[in-house]
Curated annotation (Swiss-Prot):
Organism per entry: Thermoplasma volcanium (strain ATCC 51530 / DSM 4299 / JCM 9571 / NBRC 15438 / GSS1)
Quaternary structure annotation from Swiss-Prot or TrEMBL: In the presence of PdxT, forms a dodecamer of heterodimers.
Matches recorded under SUPFAM superfamilies: Ribulose-phoshate binding barrel
Active-site positions on this chain: K87 (schiff-base intermediate with d-ribose 5-phosphate)
UniProt protein name: Pyridoxal 5'-phosphate synthase subunit PdxS
Residues that hold D-glyceraldehyde 3-phosphate according to the record: R171
Keyword hit for Transport: no
Disulphide bonds in the chain: none
Amino acid sequence: MALDLEKLKFGTELIKRGFSSMTKGGVIMDVTTAEQAKIAEKAGAVAVMALERVPADIRAAGGVARMADPKKIREILDAVTIPVMAKVRIGHISEAYTLEKLGVDMLDESEVLTPADPFFHLYKKKLTVPVVSGARNLPEAVRRIFEGAAMVRTKGEAGTGNIIEAVRHIRKVNEEIAIVRRMTQDEIKTAAENIASSYFQLRNEASTDLFGQSGKVLYDDVYYGMSREKIVKGISDILRQIRKLNRLPVVNFAAGGVATPADGALMMELGADGVFVGSGIFKSPDPEKMAKSIVEAVENYKDYDVVARVSEGLQGMPGIDIESIPRDSRLQERGW
C-alpha cells in the first residue's frame, strides 16, 4: 500500500517527535548572531538556539527578557543549514505563532525568558512547529508532554556555569520514572490527579473571587476546552506510557549549567539524550575550541581518554554558586 504523504503532514505528533529524535546524541548551542551560528555549525552542533542574549547576560541585566528580534532570527536562519530553534516566553501565544511564521524549526518555551502567562503554558498541540520545554521533575515533564511538547530538557540553572541543578533535575526524573514503573492502576490515577492540579489554579481563584471559599467549583472547561476528567485521563495515559517504556515518551535533553566537556559527558552518563549549551560556549575564553570539545565529549561520553584530551587547555566561563542566588531569583522556579 502506497504511503499517503498528504496525511503525513508537518505538525502531527509523529512528525514533531520524529524531528526532535533526529537531534539525539548531539549538542544544541545558544547563539546571538549569525557569526556565532556559523561557529556552532562548524563545531558539529546538531542545531542552534537563536536568542537576543545568552542566559548569563539575561541574568546579569535583569528586567524583562522577550523573544529575539525577528531580524536577528532571519539572519541566523540564512546563515546555517542546521535546524534553528528560538526561545518563546512561557504562555506567550502570540510570540509562539510569530516565531512559527518566521520559519524556525523548533521553539523552546523557556524559563530563561520572562514568563508571560501566570497560569498556563502554551498548548503546544495547536502549533505546527515542535516545542521543547524545561522540567525539574517528572510531574513537570508529564504536564509539558500532555500539552504537546515534542522534547523535554532539564531546567538546570541557566547562566551560572554550574551543573548541579541539571544533575538534580535529571536524577529526580530518573528516580520518579523508577517509581512509576512499580505503580498500580489506582496509584497512577492518584498521581495523575495530583499532577493535573496546577491546571485548576485559575478556576479556583476565579471561583473564590466570586463566591468565597465556600463556593462550588466547576471544572468543565479549565484548559483549552478540556475538563478536569479529560486532563486527568490524558496524564494517566502518559504515566502508563512511561511505565511501559521505562523512560519519557519523548527525547530528554540536558540544559542549564553545562560549561565544560566533562559536564556534557556527565549528563549523557546520567541518561540525557543530548545536551543544550547556553552561556558555556560563547562566555568561555575560546568559544570555537569549547564548542568543538563539548560536541566531541558528548558524542564519546563513555571514552574518558577522549574527554580528557578535548578538555586540555580549556577554561570554562566564570561560575556562580547556586546557594548565592535567592530562591525567588532562580530561573528554574519559573513555570507551573
